């Protein structure tokens, strides 16, 4: 079957999906292998749009469902071109031709089981959600740590300001007490002597020295 040929009428057929194919496996090779179990209506190998190489899986259509089941039981785990095949029932119908799919809406993926973009999108969404949650958690943690550091710096600045004010108040009180003691000492030094000392000085001044005999004779004459 050549690439780009429009698909045949596959209504009423049973499709098998064959995984783990090599890039050199051709539709004719698959047809010869699967025709041993019944009449094969169609063999389709999806290829890359740009490189035209096989994507590693194929779909084999049988006219009879029982032949498809026999082929699945026999070929699942068989080795073809050095690869162990995985054969299962296909879930979806065959997609339309690529020429028509460009104009219309995107078709369903031919076959099932983890090869389409739809099967990968939930995983990507889960990953993006987990990444967004981890980012939000890291942001909240960073904000919490920032607020903690800010509160610590504020408390430290407050404690340092309190200690500085306490030191200043202590220095002021010590300077005031020193000035008071100095003023008291000066006032004590400048204060007059006591009354007893004054009386003794006045008595000593009032007492005159004793007169000589010459002075006494002059007075008597």
From Swiss-Prot:
PTM sites of type N-acetylserine: 2
Main subcellular location: nucleus
RRM domain residues: 14-92
Pfam families listed in its UniProt record: RRM_1
Transmembrane regions listed in the UniProt entry: none
Amino acid composition bias (Basic residues), ranges on this chain: 117-171, 179-189
Post-translational changes noted in the entry: Extensively phosphorylated on serine residues in the RS domain. Phosphorylated by SRPK2 and this causes its redistribution from the nuclear speckle to nucleoplasm and controls cell fate decision in response to cisplatin treatment. KAT5/TIP60 inhibits its phosphorylation by preventing SRPK2 nuclear translocation.
Compartment list: Nucleus; Nucleus, Nucleoplasm; Nucleus speckle
Keywords assigned: Acetylation, mRNA processing, mRNA splicing, Nucleus, Phosphoprotein, RNA-binding
One GO cellular component term: cytosol
Organism domain of life: Eukaryota
Keyword field contains RNA-binding: yes
Phosphoserine modified-residue sites: 2, 26, 189, 191, 204, 206, 208, 212, 220
N6-acetyllysine: residues bearing it: 52
Cysteine pairs bridged by disulfides in the record: none
GO molecular function, one term: RNA binding
Protein family per UniProt: Belongs to the splicing factor SR family.
Assembly information from the UniProt record: In vitro, self-associates and binds SRSF1/SFRS1 (ASF/SF2), SNRNP70 and U2AF1 but not U2AF2. Binds SREK1/SFRS12. Interacts with CCNL1 and CCNL2. Interacts with SCAF11. Interacts with ZRSR2/U2AF1-RS2. Interacts with CCDC55 (via C-terminus). Interacts with BRDT.
Protein name: Serine/arginine-rich splicing factor 2
Species assigned in the record: Sus scrofa (Pig)
Lineage: Eukaryota, Metazoa, Chordata, Craniata, Vertebrata
């Amino acid at each position: 079957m050549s690439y780009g040929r429009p698909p045949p009428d596959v209504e009423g057929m049973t499709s098998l999906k064959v995984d783990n194919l090599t890039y050199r496996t051709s539709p004719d090779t698959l047809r010869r292998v699967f025709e041993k179990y019944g009449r094969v209506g169609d063999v389709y190998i999806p290829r890359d749009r740009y490189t035209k190489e096989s994507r590693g899986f194929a779909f084999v259509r049988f006219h009879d469902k029982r032949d498809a089941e026999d082929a699945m039981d026999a070929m699942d785990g068989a080795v073809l071109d050095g690869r162990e095949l995985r054969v299962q029932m296909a879930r979806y119908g065959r997609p339309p031709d690529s020429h028509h799919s460009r104009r219309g809406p995107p078709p369903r993926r031919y076959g099932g089981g983890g090869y389409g973009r739809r099967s990968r999108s939930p995983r990507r969404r889960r990953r993006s959600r987990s990444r967004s949650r981890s980012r939000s958690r890291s942001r909240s943690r960073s904000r919490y740590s920032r607020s903690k550091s800010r509160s610590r710096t504020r408390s430290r600045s407050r404690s340092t300001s309190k200690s500085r004010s306490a030191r200043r108040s202590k220095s002021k009180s010590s300077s005031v007490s020193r000035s008071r003691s100095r003023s008291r000492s000066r006032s004590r030094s400048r204060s007059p002597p006591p009354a007893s000392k004054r009386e003794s000085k006045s008595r000593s001044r009032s007492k005159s020295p004793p007169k000589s005999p010459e002075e006494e004779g002059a007075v008597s004459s």
